[in-house]
């Protein structure tokens, strides 16, 4: 048995399905909170690999734009409030202010983290030093 626990997270990105065809601008919300489980107790995040689909143009131009992942957890089994509408600026501070105790840390994915194939961009980044994910003791079903 491996000493590592691998989690595959597939966030819901619905801009095209929702009729939002505009390109994302710097600082806009790509997707809202996406839950996933880690083993109970503290779990050190070692790294992230992200697969980014190409643009929908005729040349299948790859997307290699830096982005940041935000990590948060539930409190009393209640998830943080929404980050905001997709393809828009994040929610106003007043809307998320009561949820800052759920925030764990952010992880930047920078331009140098990307490798490119003809049809796909893949970014692999090491987690920031000391990044530990720990859910509520009474949540989840992983031991």
Segments the model singles out, each with a brief description of its role:
Residues 1-143:
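Surface-exposed, low-hydrophobicity beta-strand/loop segments enriched in small/polar/acidic residues
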């Amino acid at each position: 048995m491996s000493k590592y626990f691998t989690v595959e997270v597939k966030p819901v990105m619905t801009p095209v399905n929702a009729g939002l065809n505009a390109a994302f601008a710097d600082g806009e919300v790509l997707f809202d909170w996406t839950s996933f489980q880690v083993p109970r107790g503290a779990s050190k995040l070692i790294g992230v690999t992200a697969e980014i689909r190409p643009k929908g143009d005729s040349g299948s131009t790859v997307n290699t734009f830096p982005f940041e992942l935000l990590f948060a957890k539930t409190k009393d089994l209640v998830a943080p409030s929404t980050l905001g509408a997709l393809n828009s600026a994040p929610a106003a501070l007043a809307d998320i202010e009561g949820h800052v105790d759920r925030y764990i840390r952010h992880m930047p994915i920078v331009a140098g983290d990307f490798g490119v194939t003809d049809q796909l961009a893949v970014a692999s980044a090491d987690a920031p030093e000391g990044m530990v994910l720990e859910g509520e003791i009474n949540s989840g079903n992983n031991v």
